[in-house]
């Protein structure tokens, strides 16, 4: 954000980006951000499309704060140019460049934005399938196991439960006890008061609010990219409806978040599934058929949460942040 134009008015700090040349003809956009917690500070993240013949309005991608009562998505954003579905901007026409506007309010001082990312997708395209990355086959990453159903107050806590597992993995590896958070605490810290705990960039923003940690939403091309992360020793949260993870079931429209922790010797997927009922003898760690995971994951257009210390594996395709 160093190149953003900065203005101050009525206690607000407004950061306006230069026009960002899109690398592809996108029609779906998800914004991600990482900022340190700041008492009373509220950050509104907005994006608009810039076409050769006109500009769209600024759409609000989220209102973020460490104060749960001030943190929310914005509904009712629909016009001829596009609409916002909770955390995703869908445009009626592909091919826009992008401009971002960040507005801080509510405090005397504001923390720096330490990371800002955009995930762009052309939902009309069918990416070519890449060869399997067999270095990940037979590898499983030790990751704590937790169930959303262990908490009587839970309401669709698959996302914060998955996030709790991954953060605790990094807590153990980095010897950082502040990352070992129980599920209810994570649920409160990612809550979108208008939607619940499944707002994708709210989950990654919370993970990235910790010093030295990065978190953001990405869309991958196929399972080979997921294998790259597992081969690098990094568990990945994937958006894949639970009812499609087993064969013979039909889509219902309900989403689900799970943690991919590895692959079997034959390429099936090892998952920590938060939708586990211990009273029924179920286990968090499960093996799902490769093709079932691919089918379920495609429902979210291969959406993932990438959460790691601020170092990552090489990116051969330019689909994630590869700056060291």
Where are these predicted regions, by residue range?
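Conserved active-site-adjacent core of cysteine acyl-enzyme catalytic domains
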Residues: 17, 177-323
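Histidine-centered active-site/metal-ligand motif
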Residues: 41, 158, 256
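Short, surface-exposed tryptophan/glycine-enriched loops
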Residues: 75-95, 228
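Extracellular beta-rich ligand/substrate-recognition surface
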Residues: 2-12, 216-221
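A short beta-strand element within beta-rich, extracytoplasmic domains
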Residues: 24-37, 100-102, 242
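Active-site-adjacent structural segments surrounding the nucleophilic cysteine of cysteine proteases
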Residues: 103-200, 242, 251-253, 320-323
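Short linear interaction motifs
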Residues: 9-14, 25, 80-83
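Noncatalytic regulatory segments and standalone regulatory/sensor domains
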Residues: 1, 13, 21-24, 40, ...
């Amino acid at each position: 954000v160093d190149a953003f134009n900065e203005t101050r008015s009525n206690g607000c700090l407004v950061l306006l980006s230069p026009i960002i040349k899109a690398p592809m003809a996108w029609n779906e956009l998800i914004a991600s951000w990482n900022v340190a917690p700041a008492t009373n500070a509220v950050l509104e993240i907005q994006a608009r499309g810039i076409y050769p013949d006109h500009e769209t309005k600024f759409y609000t991608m989220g209102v973020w704060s460490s104060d749960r009562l001030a943190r929310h998505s914005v509904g009712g954003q629909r016009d001829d140019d596009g609409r916002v579905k909770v955390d995703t901007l869908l445009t009626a026409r592909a091919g826009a460049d992008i401009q971002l506007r960040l507005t801080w309010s509510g405090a005397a001082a504001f923390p720096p934005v330490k990371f800002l990312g955009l995930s762009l997708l052309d939902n009309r395209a069918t990416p070519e399938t890449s060869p399997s990355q067999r270095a990940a086959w037979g590898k499983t990453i030790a990751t704590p196991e937790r169930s959303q159903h262990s908490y009587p107050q839970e309401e669709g806590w698959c996302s914060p439960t998955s996030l709790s597992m991954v953060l605790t993995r990094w807590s153990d590896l980095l010897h950082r006890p502040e990352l070992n958070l129980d599920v209810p605490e994570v649920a409160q810290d990612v809550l979108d008061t208008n939607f619940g705990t499944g707002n994708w960039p709210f989950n990654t923003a919370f993970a990235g609010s910790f010093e030295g940690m990065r978190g953001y939403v990405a869309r991958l091309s196929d399972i080979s990219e997921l294998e790259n992360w597992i081969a690098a020793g990094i568990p990945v949260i994937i958006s894949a409806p639970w009812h499609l993870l087993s064969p013979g079931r039909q889509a219902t429209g309900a989403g689900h978040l799970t943690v991919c922790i590895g692959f079997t010797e034959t390429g099936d997927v090892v998952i920590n599934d938060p939708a586990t009922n211990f009273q029924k003898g179920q286990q968090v760690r499960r093996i799902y058929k490769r093709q079932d995971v691919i089918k379920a994951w495609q429902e979210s257009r291969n959406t993932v949460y990438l959460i790691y210390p601020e170092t990552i594996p090489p990116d051969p395709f330019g689909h994630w942040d590869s700056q060291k």
